[in-house]
Structures are given as structure tokens and as C-alpha cells.
Amino acid sequence: MAESESLVPDTGAVFTFGKTKFAENIPSKFWFKNDIPICLSCGDEHTAIVTGNNKLYMFGSNNWGQLGLGSKAAIIKPTCIKALKPEKVKLAACGRNHTLVSTDTGGVYAAGGNNEGQLGLGDTDDRDTFHQIVFFTPADTIKQLSAGANTSAALTEDGKLFMWGDNSEGQIGLEDKSNVCIPHEVTVGKPISWISCGYYHSAFVTMDGELYTFGEPENGKLGLPNELLMNHRSPQRVLGIPERVIQVACGGGHTVVLTEKVVYAFGLGQFGQLGLGTFLFETSEPKIIERIKDQKICHISCGENHTALMTELGLLYTFGDGRHGKLGLGMENFTNQFFPTLCSNFLRFAVQLIACGGCHMLVFATPRLGTIDEPKFEDVYEPYISTGSFSINDLSPRSSLNRSLSARLRRRERERPPCSASMVGTLPPLEGTSASTSAYFYPSSPPFHLSVNNYPEKSPSESMEPLDSDYFEDKMNKDTETENSSAVDSENFGETNDILNMTHMMTTSSNEKLLDFSPIQKQQNQDTFEKVMESTPCTENEDSYEYEEMSKIKEVTVYKQYLAKGIYMIRPAEILEAFSDEEVGNGLDQVEEPRVFTDGKGLQSKQVGKESDEEIVSEKKTEVMEVADVKKIRESEENSKSDSLFDDLPDKTMNSESEDNKDIAEERRSSEQNMTFDSETELVEEPDSYMECERHSEQDSAEELEQPKLVEYSSEEKDEKDEKDDDEVETENLWYDRNCTEQETENVFRATRFFPKFDLKHDHLSGIPEEQEGPEDSEGNVVVEQVVQAQKENLEFEGDRKEAKAEAPSDVITEKEAPQLSETVKPEEGEMDEEISILNVEDTVEEERKEGEKEIVEEGSIPETEGSETIDITDEKLDEVLKEEDSASLLQRALREYNENPKGHMYDRVKSSSSEILGGNDPTSKDIKKAKKISFFNRMSLTGQKLMQNTNDPLPEIKPIGDQIALQSDKKDANQNHMGQNLQDSTTPNMEGKSKSCTIL
């Protein structure tokens, strides 16, 4: 206690908040030895303090010489202006870039910027030292000074008001002048008692309590009806305030008025500076600030975009723009306040003077010396107390501030170098009368001075309980007690109770099987997120750890159940979007390709898995037949699951701060599905580059499963995410459209019966840049030849597939048809079916010529019900088929060898299709679009890809590779088509970040 009393003497200290040069963005304080401030004034970025010994101290920015020290260098410590010592300074006022001073002898001095003649020296030359304004004589006893952006005002004891400087908006009340370089009297025929200059408007109060405003009329800052705004260059009375006005304060775009009973505000309030709440950002009608109408306000001050109110009890309320911490609500609270908020830091002090500037605030306060009954403060705390609510008996110097610290700023404090931490400490008292002082008054608010004679002899503090005077000092210093709070706080609450800086996690109680909804601290970036995940078993509480184990067991059980039924989960490619391209992608063609398809080995990889793929072909075929056999079982289960899978899959906004707990729960379920498929895909041989991507995906999925925290991306990652989110807004609803869910589910099951017919040699999911266009002939040749070869290689499985083809619906696309469709995307179902018809007819003709299979004819005619243009395009295709018939036989062997090699085998295709059956809650049209992206030709050139665009509508709906099948075997195709897909990833607005693909449709 004794130490704290020595830090803050009984005479009080000047507390600084915001951007003050004295302590940038860090609350600090200083005091004068054997002296006290009697006047504080804040400019845009500089400050003036007048002490009881009639000394002037200045500090802050000095670009125009506004500090009057003979130079233009900024001053970080309060510095006494020795040139004015003989004059005995009495008042000071700071404008945006100039300073006014008055002395006991009646002299008025000015220094700083003078571009509009605001120094009153008869010219427009800047001054870096104080020069006397000769207009004023000792007979003019100055009562008050005020300064605005480029304006100045002086009020005499006899009620005369003089103004000079810029009058471009009529802010000095001279109707017919643009600006004046010497003082001119402004009168309304009544003596004036108070003056305040804002940035571009001004206001004064007459002796009988009437309020007059003039200057810039925008935003309602004058408080006048529209019909009176035409005369805004002349003072006009504000009739909307019936009570007697005592004080007025003008800010950058708002005005605050103190009457005998209440406080009014009007003007611009987008930062909350009106104190009228979040639903009123501008008003020309004076409004009562209801939140503090029960408090007896004795002084008001306005900064550019914030406001401060002082009560007779010495309490301080602030509201408005919270940047730089200028509201004095704590180092962690830089948020805007839309209602008057009690500065709990000053509960142990009695506030005596306040001043608001452009980006800072100064408060002079003394320790409370007496005792006070607690009931007197009861109405003060709720609901307007600044960051926490606690009783006056619970005001320990450390806990009160620390409990309101946000996690983000607590981390910022920990990362701050030790040298900056020392700035928080109190500077030693300045020696003698030359002690430095920092006090702020806003340019648009009149300086608030406290004469020595008026220093409260019997202030409310006499009846107050003695409180620790080191209360504020300890708040300014970071204490390790915050980080080392109870284990429960650090684990469950993220070391903060600031609801704006917390998210929540649901965990399952091991004993009662209930959901515990506990807040957790959000992480700042992906690296931090991963580190926390790695240490989760060591740091989380027991319930969280048990939940993690139960989730893993549940995951294995679900996987086994799906495996027994022939239903497989497909891993969403979206999970890998948290990684940068450099971390995962290796191909030169890759730019922003989804990582799940990255492949660094190029076309050479086509020989890697050939042998192993051929060895397990029979096993894959068996699995396919089993999947078709359990169609009815899946059909019943799918009806209940179809509405949930796509919602469970995370979208690209899964890491946004505004995501709610529902999205978190859905993300956890998506992670479980991803993990299920990841474990199975390890059975298939893949290039090292792909396996690396898979490991990243598994790790990422596991981390999301262990603790589904929201992630704060770094600034670069956030920008990328935001850009992607903007592009996806238009189509996000399409992914969750459930209008055709039942129809799609039925079609999906029927489609599975077509799979045994094809070996699915080509399954890369290719996308085409919108700019690409190409001839149709070259594409048609390649398509026909590869279709013929694919059909021949699958002849041995035709017997079992005939029945399936007969039952297929008209809108189902087989895997063989999908390759051509994969190169295009159509926004209409009719357009899709036109393309489907083309492909089917080609298949029909080719099989009639080669095999004479009737079922192929049936298949080819399936989708023709959707459009008439199909037949015309089909005729052109038939001609191309006839021309290439002869060359087809020559290419058989090469194509067979090529087709047997790649990655798209029955086993992989069935897994993808089965997983899509689970996710079948998208409309049929959406699935068809995605199916059309399945690339059936691994070597289709970009020129060939252009054909597919010409035969369809524009490509605004091309989806990124994440929207296509994430086949584990896609090796060659990934590199061949990466460029086009990457372009789509970053440009097309319809690229949902969903990792959902429709293999079947």
C-alpha cells in the first residue's frame, strides 16, 4: 500500500490513453512534483497542460511547430515552455495543428500551422514559437479558449466572443467572409458563457442557457431542421433542447450538450460517439443519452470520434471510437463503444479533469481519500461497466484488469519486447515545477481548466472508502498472474471471459453422456493451431481427452459398418486448403490447385501402379457387384442420411470468426468422414507426392477432430480466404439445395448398377479454363477412339451389366459418358442432358459397329428426353465416328495399354460412387454437373478440352478439383489438367469450397 501511494501521490496524476507520443497506445501516467494540472487540452496529436504554478507543458506531434519550442521535432515527454514562464499561463487550447494560450495579464499567444490565418497574427505564415496576438489587450480578460481544425475562438469574461481562421463552411460565424487572419467578434445580441470549436463546425451557449450552432451542415451535427440549414453560416439557436444548457462540446462530426438534467447528443455516430446505441448512427434531432440520465454529469468533452463524460462523483464514462485504446477501458479493449461505458480503472480515483483529442485522451484524477457507501455505486456498474462486472469489494488491482483482457491482446502483450513493457511503468515525478505533464483536450472541445481556488475543498471523495492508489499502476503493468491463472480458466476459458474473443467447443461428458458447452480460446494462425493440436492430450482436461478417444473408436466403427455395406467415405479435398501451394503442390502446372490432387511425378507415374492395379482388378469387380447387391439397404439408409452429409462437409468459411457452434459440430462430423476414407485409401499404391498430400489431409482432419477450434488465419491466408469466399457467395446456396434430394437418391442407386459395365480406366477430374476454345474434330477423334477401346476392354463384364442398364433412369450418366462431360459445366439440366445425349449416342454407334450390343443402344438413348439439340449434334458426331472407325483398330492396342495403366479402376470408382450415395442430398442437376467433370481421358489435350466448352453453355459453374471426385489413383491426369483447374479455382464464383463430388451422376 505504501509503495502504491508513493507511485500516485495524493495530489493525483495525469493518465494518458491512446496515441500520445508519450506512450503509444499504452495507458500511462505522470504527475508534477509540488504542482497539479488546472487545464488540459488535446489537439489532433499534441497536448497542452497548464499547471497551478502557471506553467505550460507541451508534448506530441510538432509538424507545424504547434508545440512552440522553436523546432518541428516531435516531443515525447511533457516539456515546459520557458519562454512563457514570465507570463503566467492561465489557459490553453489545442486545435488540429495549432495552439492558443492566454495569460494572467490578458495576453493571447499562438503557435503552429497558420494556413487559414488561425493564429490571428494578420498573415498565413506558420510559427514554431508562440507569438502574441496584438488584437487582445489587458482589458480583455479571457475566460475560455477553443480551437478547431483551422479555427480559433476566445471568450471574454464579459461574454464577448471573438473568432478567426477558416470560414469556408461558416464555422466562425462570419457569413460573408471565407477566412479572417485577425479576430472578429461574433454576436447574437446576448452575452455568451461557453464556446466550443469542432473540426468544421462550432457552437456556443448564451448566459441564459440557449444553444447556438453554425458551420458545416452535414450529418446533422448542427442539430437544426433542414429548413434552417440554408443559414448554416450564421449562428442559429437549437430549439430541440428545452432545458437550460450549461456546456457544449463539438467533435469531428457530432455535438454533445450538457443541460442541468441530462446530456443530449446529435450528429454523426457511426463509431458510437453519440452514445445512443447501435441503431442510430446519425441524427439531426438532439437525443437524450438515456444510459447516463440518472448520473449527475458535470463536464463533457468530445474528440474527433469519441466522447467522455465526468460525473460529480468523479466517475468517467467514455464511448465512441476505441482505436488506440483512447477510451481508457483497458489495454485489451480497443473496440468501439456505442453506449456510455464506465471506466472501471478509475473507481479508486476521483476524476478531476478530462480532455479528448483526435486519437487520444487525458484524465487528471486523484486517489479517493474518504469512505463511500457501496450502494451509491450500485447503479454505476451494470450494465455499463467497461469490461467486467464486479463488486467494489472485489477490485483487486490485478484481477479487475486481467479478467477483461482478451486473448488476442494478451498474446500481443507477451510478444511485446521487454523495452516496450517498460513504457507501461510510471515515469518518475518530474523535478520541481519543470515536471513534464501530459494532458489532452480535443481541438473541438473547449479546454477544461480547474482554477486553484476552485479545487474541490469538499469533494465527494471525502466520504469515500480509502482505496489502493496503486490500482491503476498495477493495471498498466502486465502481471504473470494472468497467464498462470487457474488450470480450469486456462483450459476451458482460454484465459479470457471476453465473449467477443471466445468461441466454444462441445464435449461429451464421460459420466453422464451429456454435452458440455465450454468456451475455448481462438488461435491466431494455422501454425499455432497445429501446435495446440499436437499438445492436446497433455493440456486438455480429462473430458476432452476422453471425447477424443471416443471419437476415434466411433470413427473405426462407422468405417467398418460402411465397409460391410459397400459404402465408402470419400475424403473432401477441402481439408487441404489450409496449406499453401508450396507446402503440398509440386507440379509446375499447379498454381492454386486443391492439394488432394497434386502430383509431382507427371506422366511418368502412369507406369507406377499399373501392375498392382491389374492384380487387384478382380477384387475390385467383386466389390462392385457387392455394392450393387446391397442397393436396397443403402436406399433405405440413404433417405435418412442424404440431408446431412453435405451440410456436414466444411465449406471455405469454416475458419471464419463469425462461424457459430453448429458449423463447428458439422465440421467435426465431416472430419470423421474424412478420416474414415483416409484410412482405407492407404491400401492403394500411389506416388509419393500424393501420399504426402494424403498424410497432410489425415493430419489436418485429425487435428480438426481432436479439437474443433476456429482458426484465425494469418493476414495473407485470410486475404486468400476472403477472396475465395467472395467468389463463392453466389452459389453457396446451390450446394445446400434439397429440393431434389429424393429424386437424386433414387437415381444414384440405379446408377450404381451401371458401374460393373466399365473398367473406369480414365477417371481424372479435369477442369477447363473459361478462355480455352478449340476445334471439335480433334476432340471427337480422341473421344471416339478412347470410347471404343474402353468398351472393348470391358466386354467380359457385359453379361452382369445388361440388367443394370435396362433399369437406369434417363438422367443417369454412366462412367463411360462422364469423361466427355467432365470438361464442361452447364447451369441448366437441359443443357447437361444435351451433352449427355451426344456422348451416349457416340457410345451406341461405336458399340453397334464393334459389338452389336443392344443394351448399348438403350443406354445411348437414355438422356435424349431432355433436349432436341442432341440429335443434331449427334449426327455430326456419328460422321466423326465413321471416319475414325478404321483408325480405331490401329489404336486399340495402344489405348488398351494406356487405359489399363492409369489410376481409375473399378475399386476406386466404386468407393467414390458409394461415398457420393451417402452425400446424395444435392439436386440431381448438381450431381450431373459434378459428374460431367470426371475426366475419362488422361491424355486429352487442352485443345481437345476446348471442344467440350463449345458444345455447351459458358463455364461460370466450373467447379475446382475439390468439387470433383478425389480419387486416390489420379496420378497422370492431375498434372495434365492442373492449369485449367487452378484458373477455375481462383476465378469462377461458383467454386464452392466443398469437398463433395458426384461420381455416379
Swiss-Prot record:
Interacts with SPATA7. Interacts with PDE6D. Interacts with RPGRIP1 and RPGRIP1L; PDE6D, RPGRIP1 and RPGRIP1L may compete for the same binding sites. Interacts with NPM1. Interacts with PDE6D. Isoform 5 interacts (via N-terminus) with SMC1A and SMC3. Isoform 5 interacts with CEP290. Interacts with WHRN. Interacts with RAB37 and RAB8A (in GDP-bound forms); functions as GEF for RAB37 and RAB8A. The modification Phosphoserine is found at S518. Its main location: Golgi. Residues 404-428, 631-738, 794-869, 902-925, 962-1001 are annotated as: Disordered. Residues 631-641, 659-671, 794-818, 847-857, 902-911 have a biased composition (Basic and acidic residues). Disruption phenotype: Knockout mice show photoreceptor degeneration owing to autophagy impairment in the retina. Prenylated. A lipid is attached at C998 (S-geranylgeranyl cysteine). Keywords: Cell projection, Cilium, Cilium biogenesis/degradation, Cytoplasm, Cytoskeleton, Flagellum, Golgi apparatus, Guanine-nucleotide releasing factor, Lipoprotein, Methylation, Phosphoprotein, Prenylation, Repeat, Sensory transduction, Vision. Disulfide bonds: none annotated. It comes from the Eukaryota. One of its GO terms (cellular component) is cilium. Residues 976-1001 have a biased composition (Polar residues). This is X-linked retinitis pigmentosa GTPase regulator. One of its GO terms (molecular function) is guanyl-nucleotide exchange factor activity. Acts as a guanine-nucleotide releasing factor (GEF) for RAB8A and RAB37 by promoting the conversion of inactive RAB-GDP to the active form RAB-GTP. GEF activity towards RAB8A may facilitate ciliary trafficking by modulating ciliary intracellular localization of RAB8A. GEF activity towards RAB37 maintains autophagic homeostasis and retinal function. Involved in photoreceptor integrity. May control cilia formation by regulating actin stress filaments and cell contractility. May be involved in microtubule organization and regulation of transport in primary cilia. Residues 679-691, 717-731 have a biased composition (Acidic residues). The keyword Phosphoprotein applies. The RCC1 repeat region mediates interactions with RPGRIP1 and RAB37. Male transgenic mice carrying multiple copies of the Rpgr transgene are infertile showing normal mating but no progeny; these mice also exhibit reduced sperm numbers as well as morphological and functional defects in the sperm flagellum. GO terms for biological process: cellular response to light stimulus; eye photoreceptor cell development; intraciliary transport; positive regulation of autophagy; protein localization to non-motile cilium; retina morphogenesis in camera-type eye; visual perception. RCC1 repeats lie at residues 54-105, 106-158, 159-208, 209-261, 262-313, 314-367. Residues 999-1001 form a propeptide. PANTHER family: BTK-BINDING PROTEIN-RELATED, X-LINKED RETINITIS PIGMENTOSA GTPASE REGULATOR. The keyword Cell membrane does not apply. The modification Cysteine methyl ester is found at C998.
